[in-house]
Amino acid sequence: KRIEKKNCMNWITKFIKPKIKSLFKKRSSDNKDALWTTCECKNLLYKDDLFNNISVCPTCGSHHKLSPEERFKIFFDNKEYTILETPLPKDDPLKFSDTKKYTERLKKAREQTNQSDAIVIANGKLEGINVTVGAQNFSFIGGSLGAAAGEAFIHGIQHAIENKNPFVFFSCSGGARMQESAIALMQMTRSVLGVHELKKANLPYIVVMTNPTAGGVTASFAGLGDILIGEPKAI
């Protein structure tokens, strides 16, 4: 009986317990409507508590990813801001396909994030000062820079210049979007020229690099701020 009990406990410990943990972790981390999430330090965190701590784990200090709207709620006075409508170029001009059609990837990303593309631009006040703010969403195809994201970035700069606002940008990207090839690479040049126009207008350009900021985004507009602020593991 002791042997049977020991074998039963081994079976529960080795097979059942890990499966339950794995299932719970998957549900808490992947379901955006879940009340709980897990940290890389393996702590289980209540999402509201995590957000109230600006999405920094109170145990290990790990910075969890924030969507653009979550950042805006933290950044702007009284959580008050206006999302700016940005130009949206034609999808998939190259008819790109790998393991999945690019149009399908865009559709899925839009459904998951409720965004038209990776960059969102907003306007609001910080300490009573009007500010134009942009942010990338890593959940939208890795926050990658394509034609639509490039248009949004330029639109943000134009809005800042027209309203004489400082421009603050939260970068979070794996780089240029490979599905758009040379079109994506062109956005690097366009964004650099846009930053140049902002500086000609003598307006502050502040970049907050978040985890991760890499590739063509680092090599273009993310590295050109008058002030560069880096969150842990940003590069």
Where are the model-predicted features located?
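Terminal-region recognition feature
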Residues: R2-I206, P212, L224
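Short acidic/polar capping segments at secondary-structure boundaries
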Residues: N211-A214, A234-I235
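Short glycine/serine/threonine-rich phosphate/pyrophosphate-binding segments
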Residues: A214-F221
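Gly/Pro- and small hydrophobic-enriched strand-loop and loop-to-helix capping segments
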Residues: G225-I235
